[in-house]
C-alpha cells in the first residue's frame, strides 16, 4: 500500500495535527508529483496533461493534490473542515413484530382495530435493531461495515448520517460528531450523507447534466482559480466522470429499469459520482459497489481512500463480497451479527482477533469474507479442539468482544475523543465558520444549503429546461389536447346569437370554459409523485430545498400555461361570439389564466400534502366534484342547501364563473326571441299582454336585461366582478404557500423494512438448525449438505448443447450504427458451469438477451444452434433466464410464484400434482422452506435481497428448463455467504446435468474457482478469452502470461488480475490488443474447430433420433410457443390477478371511497330536489356530475395496469409463460366483480338521496325503474374500466394515456346532450352526439329518473302578464292546448302566473330523451364495452407485441 495510505492507517488521534498534516502533504505532493503539473491549475490544465479530465493521461491523485494546494493558497477560500464521529451505547429500535399478516380486502379492517388499540394506550412490541454499539472513526479514516443482510449495516449507516425515519435511536445513545451533536441532523445535514443502495435519478436527464447539477448545487461562494461557478461545476463534473470511468456516457440519458439508458453498472457509478460531488466530510455508503465489477469496486474504494488522505474525508462503507484489495484500503472495520457488535478496530488486526478465538481462515478467502463468515454457523470453521470454547450465538460473540482488551482500548480512545471534542465547544464554532464561508451571502447561517434560495431556484429552472428538452411529449400532448378541446367547444357553440335564446348556452359555455381552464392541470399530480423520491434524495444531500424545485417548476410551467391560455381562449372566445369588446375579451383571458394558476396550486398542494397517490385520489375526486358542482351553474346559488352553501365560498372556480358571467351579461340588453303567449290567435296581442319566455322578463319589454337575468337565475351581483379576482389571487397565493411549505416538510411514504409477511392464518416455519447448535469444524460443507440431494432426482437432466458463432449485435444511436457485440463465439454444455465476465458495459447482459431471444430492438447476426439446429419458437420457454432485477408480483407468496411458473411453463403432459410436488422439491433445494408461504412484497418490504434472488432462480428451476439456464448477476448485491450458497446450488445443478451460463461481478478467488469455463468480454463486446479456467485458474493464467501479461501473484484474485491485465480496470493500461491476440491464438482455432464438429455431430444425431423415434418437425406439443394451452393460461392468470386485487386493499378501498364518497356528495348536494324547471335541470346535472367520475376512475386503473404490464413484458412474456391475450383479458375481467359491487354502492348512495325514486311512485314502477337505474350505473363503470384498458394498451406512460383519455372523455361529455341539446348542435357535430356513449347513459338515466311525473314551477320561474280580457284560463287556453304548461290560477283576471312546463316528459323531449328507449340505451352501452375490449386487444397487439425477429445471415 502507498505511503499516504499508511499515513491514513496510523493517523494521529489529534484532529488539529491531522489537518496540519493534510496541509503539509498537499504542499509536498505538489512539489513531488510524478506528473509534471508545474505552473498549471486544475481549471487551466494543458490538454492531455495529468490534470486534464478529458485527456487519456488524467491522474485523479495529481488533480486532488493540485486542487488542494490551490485551495490552500487562496486566502479567500473557505477553511477546510473535517468530521469524525464517536459513538457509544448506540441502541436503535423499532416497533411492531418480526412477522405481520398480509392485508387483504377481507381483513384490512383488523388494522383499524389495531390502530385504535394503539391510540388508546396499548403498547407496541419493541424490536431491537442495533444493540450497544461503540466505535470511533476519526477525520480522514475509512470504516468498512461488514455483516450479512439483516444484521443492521444499513441502519447503522443511516443512524450516523441522521436518516432515522422508520426507527428510533435510544435517547441514552451518545453520538459525537467532533464536538457537534444535535446540529448535524438539520443545520449540517449535507455534511454527513447516506447513499442508498438504490439508484434514483431523472431517467430522461443525461449523465452530464445530472452531475453538473449536483456540482453546481454545492459550488462554494468563492472559487479558487479565478473561474466562475459554471466553469467550476463543468470542470468538477468532468473530473468526477473521469475518476469513475463514465466520461463516455456524458450525453447518454441515465435511464432506469424501464427506460433504456446507461448500463446498470454505469448507473451505479453515476449515483456514486453524484454523492461525491456533495463534498460531504462524512460519507456513508450502503453497498454502493452492487452491480460493479471487481475493478470498479476497487477503484471506488481507492477514490475514497484518496479523498480521505488528501481532503480528510471520513467514509463509512458497507460492502458485500469485498475484494481483498478493496478491504485493504480501509483503516477500521465494524462487524455486526444480528445487530450486535462483535468487533470494532483496525482492519489489520481483525482477522487475528478471530483466529486467536479459535477459528480458521480457509486458503484464498478474503479477510472480509472471513469476518462475515463469523456470523453464520454454516460458514465459520473452527480449529480442532476449540469446538466447545468458541462463541456460538450473537450474544456470546458480543459478550466475548465486551470482555476483550481491544474493546477496553477502544473505550479509552472514545473517552479521550469526547474529552477533546466537547459538545457545542470550540470546534463547533470553527465548523460553522467554515460552512458560512462556503455559503452564498444571501443564505441563512443555520441553513444546511450552500446556494441561496434564489440560486437554487435558478439552478432547478436550468434542470427543468433540460428535462423539458429531453422529453417534451407530455407538454406538447397537453397543449395539443387543450387546443382541440377548445376548437370542439367553440364549434359546438359557434356564433351564438346575442338574444335570449342563447342564455342557457352562454352559461353552459362559460361553465365548461372555466372547468377546462381550471381542471386541465390535474395530471400534474402524477408528475409530482414520479419525481418525489429524487427530490427528497437531493434534499438529504442538501443540494436544494424541495420547495426551490417546486417553485422553479411553477415558473417552468408558466410559458406553457400562458401559451395554452392564449391559444385555447382566443379560439373559444371569438368563434362562439362572446361579448365583442376589448375589455371583456382581455378580462376573460386574464380570469381564465389566473384560474389555471390557482387550480394548478390546488392540485400541487393536494399532492404535496399526501404521501402517496393512492391516498389522495378518492379525496381529490370528491373535491373536484365539489369544485365543479358549486361553481353556481350546475346548482344555482338559490338551490344550494344550507349545510353546503359554504363550499361555494371556498371554491375559487365559483368566483371565476361569477366574474365571467358578469363580464358577459353586465349592462347588456338581449332582444327577446320567444314570447308567451304566441302563435295562432295571439298575433295581434300587444307587448303589455305577453312576456318574454325567460327568467326575469318584464311585460311590455322586448328585451331582457343581463343584470336582472344573472341576479334572478344565479343571484350574481355586478359589483363582485373585480372583488372575485382579488379572492382568486388570494387563493392562488395561499395554495401556493401551502404547496411550497408542504413540499419541504412532508415526505413520501417509505418502505416498512424487510420483515417477512404471511397471509393471515399462515405462520413462519422455524429454522431447522439454529445458531445455538454446537459448532462443527466443517464450515461450508454444512451448506453443501443442506442443499444436497433433496429433490435433485426430480431436476430435469439435460442433453442438448447450445452453441453460437460470430454473434454480433448492432443498434442505431442517432444516425450512427453502434456495435454492442462483436463476433462472439461459444457454447454451453450439460454439466458445465460457464462464467460470463467483463467490465461494466462490455455487453454481458446484452449477450444473454441475444442468446435467449429476448432483444426487442437492434440487428442480430451470427449463428445460434441447439443440437446443430436453429432455435425454434419454443426456445424461450425451454430455457430458464434468471434476470439481474428480481422482478416478482409483490402480492404473491413464494410458493404461489413457483407454482405459477411450474403450472404454465412445464409441459402440458405433466400431471398437475407432479408439478406441485416438483415445486415443493425446488423449495427444499433452495432452502426456502422457512419462508415458502411468505409474501414477496416490493423491494424494501417483505423478502430481503438474498431471498428474492433465491426466488428468482427458483422460478426458473420450477419451469424445468429442457435446454439450459441463463443467470444474470445471480450474486449481485449479496454477501459472500449467500453468494457461496448460490454457487453451491449452481454446482449441484451442474452435477445433475444442468447447462448453465452465468454472468458474475466481483467474484472472490474462491468463488471464481467454482466455474468450469470462462467467456471473457472487453469493452465493445469483443471476446478476450473463451475456454477452461483450470485448477487454481492455471489454464486461464497461463494463456494471458503466454501472450504478454505479467505473472499473477500467488495471493492475487485471478478474476481481478485479468481485468488489470487487459486494461479494463480504471487507471490500468495495456499495449496489447487482446481481442486480436485471441483471434490469432491456437485456442481460438480450437474453438472454431469444435464449433464445426458440434454443429455436424449434433445435427446428425438429432436427425437420426427424429427418424428412429418417428418424431416430426410438426410436433405441436414440442415446438409450440407456450407450454400450456390458452384456456389453462387464462385460468391461472385470472386466478393470480383476482388474488392480487384481493390482496391490494388500498386499491379497492380507494375505488370504494371514490365511488361511495362521490355518490354521497352528489346525492346529498341535490337532496330531494323538487321537480321545478331548475330542479329538473339540477337532477340532469346530478347525472352529469356523476359521469365526471370517469376521469378519476381511469386514473386509478391506469397506473395499476402499467405496473402489471411492466412485470409481464420484462419477465413473463420473454419467458413465454403465457400469452398477451391471457394477460390482457384477465386484467379486464378482474374489474367486473368489483365494478358490479361499486355499482350497487354508488346506486344506493346517489339514487335515493337525490330522491329520483319519488318520480316513479305515480306510475307504481319504483322497483323496475330502480333496477334499470342500477343497470345503467353498472354499464357506466364497466365502460370506464374497459375504456381505461383501451387507452393505456398502447402507451408507455399513464400520463400520455391520461391526456388522450381526458380528451375523449371531454368529447363524450360535450356531446352527450346536456350542455348543448341535439337541436342546438351544428349539423356537422350531430354524428358525435350519436357516437358518444354518454349520450345513451344520460338519456337512459335521465328518462328512468324523472319520466312520467308532473312539474311544479318555482316562484321565479312563473311568467307573469295580464290577459287582454276575461280570465287567465280563457286567455291562455289555446296556447296551453298546443304547447302545454299550466296556470297557477286559471280564474285570475290579472297578473297571470304561467308555468311553461307541466310534465317532465316535455323536459325530456327537449333533450331528446325518452323512457321508451331505456333498453335500447342499455344494449348500446354493451356495444361500447365490447368495442373497448376489442380495441384494447387490437392496439396492444399492434403496438406492443414483438414481431418474430430472425437473426440475419452470418455477417463479417
From Swiss-Prot:
Disruption phenotype: Does not lead to growth defects or changes in developmental patterns and does not affect sensitivity to itraconazole, amphotericin B, voriconazole, posaconazole, ravuconazole, or echinocandins. Its main location: membrane. CDD domains: ABCG_PDR_domain1, ABCG_PDR_domain2. Glycans are attached at residues 2, 10, 228, 287, 311, 1350, 1365, 1391. The keyword ATP-binding applies. SUPFAM superfamilies: P-loop containing nucleoside triphosphate hydrolases (SSF52540). It is found in: Membrane. It is a multi-pass membrane protein. This is ABC multidrug transporter A. The gene is abcA.
Amino acid at each position: 500500500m502507498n505511503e499516504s495510505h499508511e499515513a491514513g492507517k496510523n493517523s494521529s488521534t489529534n484532529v488539529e495535527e491531522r489537518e496540519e498534516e493534510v496541509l503539509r502533504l498537499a504542499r509536498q505532493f505538489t512539489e513531488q508529483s510524478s506528473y509534471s503539473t508545474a505552473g498549471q491549475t486544475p481549471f487551466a490544465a494543458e490538454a492531455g496533461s495529468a490534470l486534464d479530465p478529458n485527456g487519456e493521461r488524467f491522474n485523479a491523485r495529481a488533480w486532488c493534490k493540485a486542487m488542494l494546494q490551490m485551495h490552500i493558497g487562496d486566502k479567500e477560500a473557505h477553511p477546510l473542515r473535517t468530521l469524525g464521529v464517536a459513538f457509544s451505547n448506540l441502541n436503535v429500535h423499532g416497533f411492531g413484530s418480526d412477522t405481520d399478516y398480509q392485508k387483504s380486502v377481507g381483513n384490512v379492517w383488523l388494522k383499524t382495530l389495531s390502530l385504535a388499540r394503539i391510540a388508546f394506550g396499548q403498547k407496541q412490541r419493541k424490536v431491537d435493531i442495533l444493540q450497544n454499539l461503540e466505535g470511533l472513526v476519526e477525520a480522514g479514516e475509512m470504516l468498512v461495515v461488514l455483516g450479512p443482510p439483516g444484521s443492521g449495516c444499513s441502519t447503522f449507516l443511516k443512524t450516523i448520517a441522521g436518516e432515522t425515519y422508520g426507527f428510533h435511536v435510544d435517547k441514552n445513545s451518545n453520538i459525537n460528531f467532533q464536538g457537534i451533536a444535535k446540529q448535524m441532523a438539520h443545520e449540517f445535514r449535507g455534511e454527513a450523507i447516506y447513499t442508498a443502495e438504490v439508484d434514483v435519478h431523472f431517467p430522461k436527464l443525461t449523465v452530464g447534466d445530472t452531475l453538473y447539477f449536483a456540482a453546481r448545487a454545492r459550488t462554494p461562494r468563492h472559487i479558487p482559480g479565478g473561474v466562475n461557478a459554471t466553469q467550476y461545476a463543468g470542470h468538477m463534473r468532468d473530473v468526477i466522470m473521469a475518476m469513475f470511468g463514465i466520461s463516455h456516457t456524458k450525453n447518454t440519458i441515465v435511464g432506469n429499469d424501464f427506460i433504456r439508458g446507461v448500463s446498470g453498472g454505469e448507473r451505479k457509478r453515476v449515483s456514486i459520482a453524484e454523492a461525491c460531488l456533495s463534498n460531504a466530510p462524512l460519507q456513508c455508503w450502503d453497498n454502493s459497489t452492487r452491480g460493479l465489477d471487481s475493478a470498479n469496486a476497487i477503484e471506488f474504494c481507492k477514490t475514497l481512500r484518496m479523498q480521505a488522505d488528501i481532503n480528510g474525508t471520513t467514509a463509512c462503507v458497507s460492502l458485500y463480497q469485498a475484494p481483498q484489495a478493496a478491504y485493504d484500503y480501509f483503516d477500521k472495520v465494524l462487524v455486526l451479527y444480528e445487530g450486535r457488535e462483535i468487533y470494532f478496530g483496525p482492519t489489520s488486526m481483525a482477522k487475528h482477533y478471530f483466529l486467536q478465538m479459535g477459528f480458521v481462515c480457509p486458503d484464498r478467502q478474503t479477510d472480509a469474507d472471513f469476518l462475515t463468515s463469523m456470523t453464520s454457523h454454516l460458514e465459520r470453521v473452527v480449529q480442532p479442539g476449540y469446538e466447545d470454547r468458541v462463541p456460538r450465538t450473537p450474544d456470546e460473540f458480543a459478550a466475548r468482544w465486551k470482555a476483550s482488551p481491544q474493546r477496553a482500548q477502544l473505550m479509552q480512545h472514545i473517552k479521550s475523543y469526547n474529552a477533546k471534542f466537547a459538545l457545542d465547544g470550540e470546534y463547533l464554532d470553527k465548523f460553522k465558520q467554515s460552512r458560512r464561508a462556503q455559503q452564498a451571502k444571501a443564505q441563512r447561517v443555520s441553513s444546511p444549503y450552500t446556494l441561496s434560495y434564489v440560486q437554487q431556484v435558478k439552478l432547478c429552472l436550468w434542470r427543468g429546461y433540460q428535462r423539458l428538452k429531453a422529453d417534451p411529449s407530455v407538454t406538447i400532448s397537453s397543449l395539443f389536447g387543450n387546443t382541440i378541446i377548445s376548437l370542439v367547444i367553440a364549434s359546438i357553440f359557434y356564433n351564438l346569437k346575442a338574444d335570449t335564446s342563447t342564455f342557457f348556452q352562454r352559461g353552459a359555455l362559460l361553465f365548461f370554459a372555466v372547468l377546462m381552464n381550471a381542471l386541465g392541470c390535474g395530471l400534474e399530480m402524477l408528475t409530482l409523485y414520479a419525481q418525489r423520491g429524487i427530490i427528497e434524495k437531493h434534499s438529504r444531500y442538501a443540494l436544494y430545498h424541495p420547495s426551490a424545485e417546486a417553485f422553479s417548476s411553477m415558473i417552468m410551467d408558466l410559458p406553457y400555461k400562458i401559451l395554452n391560455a392564449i391559444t385555447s381562449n382566443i379560439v373559444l372566445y371569438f368563434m362562439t361570439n362572446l361579448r365583442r369588446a376589448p375589455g371583456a375579451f382581455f378580462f376573460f383571458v386574464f380570469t381564465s389564466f389566473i384560474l389555471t394558476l390557482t387550480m394548478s396550486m390546488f392540485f400541487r398542494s393536494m399532492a404535496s400534502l399526501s404521501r402517496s397517490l393512492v391516498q389522495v385520489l378518492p379525496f381529490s375526486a370528491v373535491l373536484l366534484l365539489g369544485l365543479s358542482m358549486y361553481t353556481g351553474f350546475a346548482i344555482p346559488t338559490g338551490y344550494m342547501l344550507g349545510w353546503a352553501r359554504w363550499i361555494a365560498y371556498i371554491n375559487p372556480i365559483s368566483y371565476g364563473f361569477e366574474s365571467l358571467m358578469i363580464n358577459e351579461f353586465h349592462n347588456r340588453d338581449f332582444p327577446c326571441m320567444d314570447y308567451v303567449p304566441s302563435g295562432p290567435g295571439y298575433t295581434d296581442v300587444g307587448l303589455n299582454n305577453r312576456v318574454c319566455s325567460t327568467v326575469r322578463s318584464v311585460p311590455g319589454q322586448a328585451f331582457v336585461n343581463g343584470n336582472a337575468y344573472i341576479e334572478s337565475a344565479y343571484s350574481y351581483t355586478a359589483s363582485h366582478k373585480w372583488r372575485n379576482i382579488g379572492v382568486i389571487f388570494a387563493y392562488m397565493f395561499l395554495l401556493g404557500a401551502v404547496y411550497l411549505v408542504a413540499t419541504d416538510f412532508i415526505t413520501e411514504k417509505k418502505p416498512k423494512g424487510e420483515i417477512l409477511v404471511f397471509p393471515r392464518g399462515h405462520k413462519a416455519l422455524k429454522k431447522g438448525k439454529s445458531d445455538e447448535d454446537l459448532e462443527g469444524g466443517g464450515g461450508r460443507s454444512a451448506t453443501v449438505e443442506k442443499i444436497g440431494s433433496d429433490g435433485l432426482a426430480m431436476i430435469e437432466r439435460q442433453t442438448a448443447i447450445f452453441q453460437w458463432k460470430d454473434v454480433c449485435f448492432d443498434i442505431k444511436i442517432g444516425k450512427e450504427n453502434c456495435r454492442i457485440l462483436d463476433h462472439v463465439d461459444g457454447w454451453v454444455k450439460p454439466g458445465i458451469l460457464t462464467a460470463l465476465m467483463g467490465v461494466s458495459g462490455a455487453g454481458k447482459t446484452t449477450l444473454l438477451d441475444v442468446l435467449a431471444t429476448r432483444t426487442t430492438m437492434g440487428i442480430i447476426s451470427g449463428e445460434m444452434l441447439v443440437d446443430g439446429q436453429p432455435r425454434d419458437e419454443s426456445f424461450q420457454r425451454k430455457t430458464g433466464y434468471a434476470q439481474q432485477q428480481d422482478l416478482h408480483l409483490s402480492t404473491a407468496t413464494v410458493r404461489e410464484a413457483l407454482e405459477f411458473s411450474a403450472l404454465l411453463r412445464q409441459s402440458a403432459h405433466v400431471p398437475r400434482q407432479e408439478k406441485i410436488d416438483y415445486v415443493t422439491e425446488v423449495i427444499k433445494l433452495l432452502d426456502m422452506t422457512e419462508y415458502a408461504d411468505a409474501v414477496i412484497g416490493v423491494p424494501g418490504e417483505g423478502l430481503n435481497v438474498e431471498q428474492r434472488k433465491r426466488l428468482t432462480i427458483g422460478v426458473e428451476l420450477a419451469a424445468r428448463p429442457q435446454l439450459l439456464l441463463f443467470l444474470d448477476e445471480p450474486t449481485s448485491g449479496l454477501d459472500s455467504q449467500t453468494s457461496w450458497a448460490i454457487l453451491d446450488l449452481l454446482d449441484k445443478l451442474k452435477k445433475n446435468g444442468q447447462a448453465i451460463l452465468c454472468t458474475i461481478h466481483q467474484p472472490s478467488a474462491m468463488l471464481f474457482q467454482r466455474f468450469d469455463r470462462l467467456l471473457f468480454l472487453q469493452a465493445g463486446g469483443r471476446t478476450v478469452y473463451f475456454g477452461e479456467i483450470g485448477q487454481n485458474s492455471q489454464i486461464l493464467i497461463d494463456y494471458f502470461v503466454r501472450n504478454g501479461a505479467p505473472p499473477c501473484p500467488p495471493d492475487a484474485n485471478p478474476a481481478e488480475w485479468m481485468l488489470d491485465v487487459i486494461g479494463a480496470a480504471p487507471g490500468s493500461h495495456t499495449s496489447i490488443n487482446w481481442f486480436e491476440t485471441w483471434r490469432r491464438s491456437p485456442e481460438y482455432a480450437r474453438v472454431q474447430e469444435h464449433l464445426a464438429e458440434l454443429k455436424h455431430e449434433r445435427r446428425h444425431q438429432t436427425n437420426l433420433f427424429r427418424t428412429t423415434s418417428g418424431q416430426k418437425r410438426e410436433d405441436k406439443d414440442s415446438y409450440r410457443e407456450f407450454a400450456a394451452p390458452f384456456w389453462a393460461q387464462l385460468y391461472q392468470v385470472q386466478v393470480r390477478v383476482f388474488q392480487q386485487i384481493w390482496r391490494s386493499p388500498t386499491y379497492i378501498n380507494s375505488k370504494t371511497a371514490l365511488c361511495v364518497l362521490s355518490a354521497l356528495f352528489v346525492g346529498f348536494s341535490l337532496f330531494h330536489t323538487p321537480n321545478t324547471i331548475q330542479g329538473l335541470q339540477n337532477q340532469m346535472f346530478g347525472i352529469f356530475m356523476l359521469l365526471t367520475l370517469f376521469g378519476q376512475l381511469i386514473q386509478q386503473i391506469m397506473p395499476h395496469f402499467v405496473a402489471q404490464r411492466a412485470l409481464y413484458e420484462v419477465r413473463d412474456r420473454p419467458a413465454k409463460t403465457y400469452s398477451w391475450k391471457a394477460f390482457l383479458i384477465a386484467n379486464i375481467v378482474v374489474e367486473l366483480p368489483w365494478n358490479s359491487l361499486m355499482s350497487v354502492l354508488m346506486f344506493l348512495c346517489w339514487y335515493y338521496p337525490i330522491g329520483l325514486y319519488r318520480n316513479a311512485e305515480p306510475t307504481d314502477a319504483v322497483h323496475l325503474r330502480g333496477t334499470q337505474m342500477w343497470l345503467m350505473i353498472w354499464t357506466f363503470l364497466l365502460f370506464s374500466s374497459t375504456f381505461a384498458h383501451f387507452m393505456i394498451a398502447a402507451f408507455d406512460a399513464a400520463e400520455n394515456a391520461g391526456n388522450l383519455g381526458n380528451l375523449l372523455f371531454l368529447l363524450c361529455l360535450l356531446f352527450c346532450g346536456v350542455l348543448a341539446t341535439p337541436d342546438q348542435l351544428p349539423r356537422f357535430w350531430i354524428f358525435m352526439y350519436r357516437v358518444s356513449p354518454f349520450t345513451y347513459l344520460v338519456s337512459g338515466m335521465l328518462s328512468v329518473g324523472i319520466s312520467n311525473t308532473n312539474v311544479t314551477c318555482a316562484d321565479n320561474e312563473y311568467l307573469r302578464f295580464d290577459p287582454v280580457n276575461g280570465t287567465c284560463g280563457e286567455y291562455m287556453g289555446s296556447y296551453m292546448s298546443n304547447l302545454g304548461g299550466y296556470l297557477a290560477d286559471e280564474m285570475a283576471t290579472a297578473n297571470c302566473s304561467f308555468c311553461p312546463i307541466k310534465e317532465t316528459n316535455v323536459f325530456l323531449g327537449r333533450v331528446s330523451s325518452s323512457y321508451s328507449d331505456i333498453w335500447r340505451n342499455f344494449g348500446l352501452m354493451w356495444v361500447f364495452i365490447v368495442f373497448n375490449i376489442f380495441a384494447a386487444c387490437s392496439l396492444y397487439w399492434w403496438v406492443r407485441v414483438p414481431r418474430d425477429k430472425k437473426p440475419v445471415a452470418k455477417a463479417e
